[in-house]
Amino acid sequence: MESRVLLRTFCLIFGLGAVWGLGVDPSLQIDVLTELELGESTTGVRQVPGLHNGTKAFLFQDTPRSIKASTATAEQFFQKLRNKHEFTILVTLKQTHLNSGVILSIHHLDHRYLELESSGHRNEVRLHYRSGSHRPHTEVFPYILADDKWHKLSLAISASHLILHIDCNKIYERVVEKPSTDLPLGTTFWLGQRNNAHGYFKGIMQDVQLLVMPQGFIAQCPDLNRTCPTCNDFHGLVQKIMELQDILAKTSAKLSRAEQRMNRLDQCYCERTCTMKGTTYREFESWIDGCKNCTCLNGTIQCETLICPNPDCPLKSALAYVDGKCCKECKSICQFQGRTYFEGERNTVYSSSGVCVLYECKDQTMKLVESSGCPALDCPESHQITLSHSCCKVCKGYDFCSERHNCMENSICRNLNDRAVCSCRDGFRALREDNAYCEDIDECAEGRHYCRENTMCVNTPGSFMCICKTGYIRIDDYSCTEHDECITNQHNCDENALCFNTVGGHNCVCKPGYTGNGTTCKAFCKDGCRNGGACIAANVCACPQGFTGPSCETDIDECSDGFVQCDSRANCINLPGWYHCECRDGYHDNGMFSPSGESCEDIDECGTGRHSCANDTICFNLDGGYDCRCPHGKNCTGDCIHDGKVKHNGQIWVLENDRCSVCSCQNGFVMCRRMVCDCENPTVDLFCCPECDPRLSSQCLHQNGETLYNSGDTWVQNCQQCRCLQGEVDCWPLPCPDVECEFSILPENECCPRCVTDPCQADTIRNDITKTCLDEMNVVRFTGSSWIKHGTECTLCQCKNGHICCSVDPQCLQEL
């Protein structure tokens, strides 16, 4: 109900906008004949009178030709057409009777993105295209276009909606897979042929146009209805709603995360800090660490060597080191007995009687220090040492470092006989003359290392280390030698590649019969593997089920080889790669579509009126057929009813729409068969009996350009049945059994879809907006919409036919 209201509203809002004037905006128009600049010098075509005199018309002759847009012209076409879902193909034509040819073709390599074809052999118009899932599709419209008469044809494509008008009459309207116009570079545009060798259109074409606009058929038939928006317009509205829903869901999720973060941020003050030796410093804060000036920048400590000042000291003071500081500062001095002492320094003086007196520099004066007595020593007098700064002797080997010293980080205290001194650790150098502060020596930068060739020097605190270059292994702490990755099996070569050791590395080369860069080698099969086969070894193909042969070129006929046993009411029909059981004439499927044909049941021809009994007979239904019986006592004519007309008993006639089939009436039954071909008869109809055509000009070249077929030969190519008829190749889709199920899938390398019960496995998505999904955030999602599951980064969900289908993207996980 909601979808119908939405559509009516959309028609009211946008319907009037679709009623344009009959003039076409040139930016939306591709006038093919004008842009290709066809003329008298163009081989294979010539200008002739058309349906009207307003534009030029050209006769496409049965001669070799190459009507192909130049690269620049084709790209101009594709710039207007690329990634558009609303366009119309228009053409006025007069096609030669029985000709099968391509009107226009847009293809890249073997991929037909858009090709319009008319088959006079089978009396049908075909549209070949690729869908958004990159699968090839063919829509067949039964219609006699190749009748040597003028026709106006328009094919309007609007998203998944096709409308075919012929002579301003709507002939067909279908819902299909949405065609893709994501045309890659190198795509080609052909007119009147598929390529240089195939699909030659024979006849006259006029007014060949592509209109990239809604309801483009109006340009050809102005009186047609155009008051309501197109399917693409409606799909666009639905898409916008889905996009808005997705934006709303993402915005709500972002808002929820932002609120959570704000709640956490309200509880704390976040600032980048630095921590050094147990002390935390704020951003941009600077401090002195020994002889380094350090700063906290963006949470990282950056230090530089401190540059000490050299101040002028006042009278009775001089520069001296101060405990805990790197640079010298002005310090008071004392002059005593011709020597200079700094504040706090002590000195002993011995009298002539040997009495020791201790002095200390205080307030620029040497003052007497009272003696507090000395501890008893436990060493002989010969091992006792007299000190210059104390009246108390110590034993030899006394630990002066245990008392007090000024040796900082990376400097160690060493005991001398009468005092302690500082010494830099190995690998460090002094920052001042007393060795109290030291810094690391970068042996690598200064060339003071022993690393040899094939190594790289890496500085470490107080030392260095030599690491091996890539492709080398260690001999000792300073040397490395070449590493043969091939012998040690430490290479990345493919199992089908040969490893060759090189200096510092190795090379990988694919073995004969394989191709690739060495790290990845794939088997190479000279003739290729057809029908989905995989090349698994040099010139060895692994064929999919249903095919055999060196190149998987031969279809296995399951029907004739006895692999299949169909029900007695069904015939086995072989298809490329597989088969199916099709109900015999007189039977139809009951809707269960049993694979073996058990679901075939009798058709009551009498009850349904599908019989040929004349009015003077009575129809009796039989299993798989019927009987025309004459009532007792009456003299029946044995006439037949065919296509609403009376055919007399014994009468023979040719079908109106199939000149190659002959029918006869025999006692109320109509029996039809193909014409018997007598190749000895000089008047034999070569159209019906192509096998009787010996002319070389009637032969056909296979699409691969290698195989030559005689007229009448048939073959299968890319899920199409192809036939050579008097030099023309005509291909049509292989018949597939009906798939009466909600969900279907087209397996890879197969031609016909199969039913599946899991909607997430289905290939196609029905664009029914009434089938919605409710996601994990309680947001309504339309069929076809996709989203990233809330709380995840790599789980992609999609609404398919009202079901939520989710999968994890492996590439996304690798990028995290």
Swiss-Prot record:
Gene Ontology MF terms in the entry: calcium ion binding; heparin binding; identical protein binding; protein kinase C binding
Location of the EGF-like domain: 397-439, 440-481, 482-522, 523-553, 555-601, 602-637
Outcome (variant: residue 452 to A): Diminished binding to ROBO3
Keywords, alphabetical: Calcium, Disulfide bond, EGF-like domain, Glycoprotein, Neurogenesis, Repeat, Secreted, Signal
Residues annotated as domain VWFC: 272-331, 638-693, 698-756
Cystine crosslinks: 401-413, 407-422, 424-438, 444-457, 451-466, 468-480, 486-499, 493-508, 510-521, 525-535, 529-541, 543-552, 559-572, 566-581, 583-600, 606-619, 613-628, 630-636
Broad class of the protein's primary localization: secreted
Keyword Calcium: yes
Subunit note: Homotrimer. Binds to PRKCB. Interacts with NICOL1; this interaction triggers epididymal differentiation. Interacts (via the EGF domains) with ROBO3 (via Fibronectin type-III 1 domain) with a 3:3 stoichiometry; this interaction promotes oligomerization of ROBO3 resulting in the repulsion of commissural axons in the midline.
Protein name: Protein kinase C-binding protein NELL2
Gene behind the chain: NELL2
